[in-house]
């Protein structure tokens, strides 16, 4: 049977819905406020990319977090850091579609930038343990893609969604770390010293992975039935 082609109007409507959901989740403060994210938008980030694709997912997330940041204003600098959210959505979208090369390049470049920054040598290595696990998982996913084993059948879809949410959110984390450490905004924006950073690295190593786990659960719980419904209705965006 020939697949039904989604119309432009339907695409615009779906993008608008996800942009609105990103606005809503970004307009409320998260608990606790420490860690990478200060709102609940991390729950929507991977799912937006998975459903909409890398470009539309990026666009919907940008619109959502920018409006959300105006509604729930943190500070002017957060408008820069929150660009990690659309990047995370795009990474989730790329990996879901088996496009691993941009994701591998992104992780490699941002890790290199961090570890080549002198102040990073004074921070606890274990403080970014979740990003290391994400990178290791990414390498496993790449192996599976190359072997033709990266399948999205209904029985495997929950695992695929959980993995993609994890890798996508950690890509967001890496962007914010890149802005904070290699770009020196910890000093230029906030006037922090090494002792301050060491405390932040210690607390973030606990809180951030908990939020990533919550998002992975939400992505599987919502994403699995939603993807099946969109596929049956012929409304799944493939690009």
Task: Locate the predicted segments by residue.
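Loop-helix junctions at membrane interfaces
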Residues: 1-239
């Amino acid at each position: 049977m020939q697949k039904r082609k989604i119309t432009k109007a339907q695409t615009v409507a779906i993008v608008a819905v996800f942009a609105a959901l990103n606005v809503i989740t970004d307009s409320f403060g998260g608990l606790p406020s420490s860690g990478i994210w200060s709102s609940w938008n991390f729950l929507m980030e991977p799912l937006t990319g998975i459903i909409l694709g890398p470009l539309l997912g990026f666009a919907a997330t940008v619109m959502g977090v920018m409006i959300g940041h105006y509604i729930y204003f943190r500070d002017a600098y957060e408008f820069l850091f929150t660009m990690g959210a659309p990047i995370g959505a795009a990474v989730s979208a790329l990996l879901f579609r088996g496009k691993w090369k941009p994701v591998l390049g992104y992780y490699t470049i941002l890790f290199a930038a961090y570890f080549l920054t002198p102040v990073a040598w004074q921070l606890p290595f274990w403080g970014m343990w979740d990003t290391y696990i994400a990178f290791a998982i990414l390498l496993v996913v790449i192996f599976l893609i190359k072997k033709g084993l990266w399948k999205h059948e209904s029985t495997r879809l929950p695992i695929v969604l959980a993995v993609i949410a994890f890798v996508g959110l950690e890509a967001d984390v890496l962007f914010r770390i890149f802005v904070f450490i290699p770009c020196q905004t910890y000093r230029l924006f906030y006037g922090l010293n090494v002792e301050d950073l060491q405390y932040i690295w210690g607390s973030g190593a606990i809180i951030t992975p908990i939020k990533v786990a919550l998002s992975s659960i939400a992505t599987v719980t919502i994403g699995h039935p939603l993807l099946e419904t969109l596929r049956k209705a012929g409304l799944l965006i493939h690009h």
